[in-house]
């Protein structure tokens, strides 16, 4: 298995104007990511608009990613659901495709208790044989799992890491105080990921599952590489670009701003599926302004 660390792009799912999946654009996006030295890929996460994909479409996206990637970089496949049985079904499916790990979110909408959240992860863990990255994203799930709960979840043998999207850079240190094993800690917040790396330590078991790297994969990957090489000046220069773009790409519900940016620089349709909608004119101008400042258009 690959070492799971570094910048993993939370891939968008490109759509055609009729809202069907644009398979050619998706395959081209993967090639472009790999050619820009991205460390890994995450299909069917939040940025993929996964809740709007049918199960058949979900399977197709994962299959395409596995086929085109062809083991050149590791894949962490999203297999989340607020239904435990559906999460098990999806995790078993991605396991059958020999991906490197599954990304499983804290269950959304149901608002389970801490015990219910733990039992959800334990059930997925016990029903499968794949390494699992737990995913905490309170803006989407309405629950911010506590450090104690996350440490309990991470104590399960094959739950090997965490993606935390809170932007709380104290979380890596808090978890280190509670855990008796080494885990990989991914930031899910582009704006604070460099600080998250620093708090995770210099050993390299850290990274970012990124929205921004859809647009600037090389800059984002170079930032992580510079951090590991202890080149803080280079890392901080790259971080400024990541931070500026992150602010623009979250001006409206994600991934609509990212898709609009990619329509300007990568010839990918800005189409998103309802209930998401394309950017307002005001927000289009915000994205365009940032892309111009970064000399991307």
Curated annotation (Swiss-Prot):
Its EC number is 4.3.3.7. Homotetramer; dimer of dimers. It comes from Ehrlichia chaffeensis (strain ATCC CRL-10679 / Arkansas). This is 4-hydroxy-tetrahydrodipicolinate synthase. SUPFAM superfamilies: Aldolase (SSF51569). The record marks 46, 109 as: Part of a proton relay during catalysis. Pathway: Amino-acid biosynthesis; L-lysine biosynthesis via DAP pathway; (S)-tetrahydrodipicolinate from L-aspartate: step 3/4. The active site is at residues 135, 163. InterPro entries: Aldolase_TIM, DapA, DapA-like. Its main location: cytoplasm. It catalyses: L-aspartate 4-semialdehyde + pyruvate = (2S,4S)-4-hydroxy-2,3,4,5-tetrahydrodipicolinate + H2O + H(+). Pyruvate binds at residues 47, 209. Pfam families: DHDPS (PF00701).
